């Protein structure tokens, strides 16, 4: 048995367009944009989706959006999503990147939220 939940919605913007994307999304959603000093490629859109981290991520790739799913068992969650039709396309440290039906990306990562939030909001899978 393992647990998982959507941890973040990321708006991936090419690095040279990221500042403009941050300005747009911050104004469009009426929220404050806050860079993450420990991870400069991310700028959090504070409270854009209450309970879910939302950020613009500067990437060296095409623009897209993706979800981060946090889990207490990366192998089990990856296997569950693959059984549903996803395909693992890469791995970086503990994180796995999957392409899901429809072509979008999902990152499976270790639990990032506080224990109380994760316990209260995560789905339990057999």
Identify the residue ranges that each predicted region occupies:
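Sparse recognition of residues in long alpha-helices and their boundaries
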Residues: 41, 83, 118-119
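Core segments of cupin and vicinal oxygen chelate
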Residues: 1-51, 76-77
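Conserved short beta-strand elements that form part of the metal-binding/catalytic scaffold
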Residues: 29-65, 105-115
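Vicinal oxygen chelate
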Residues: 15, 62, 67-105
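N-terminal beta-strand motif that seeds the catalytic metal site of vicinal oxygen chelate
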Residues: 1-22, 65, 69, 112-126
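Alpha-helix boundary/capping residues
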Residues: 25-28, 81-85, 122-125
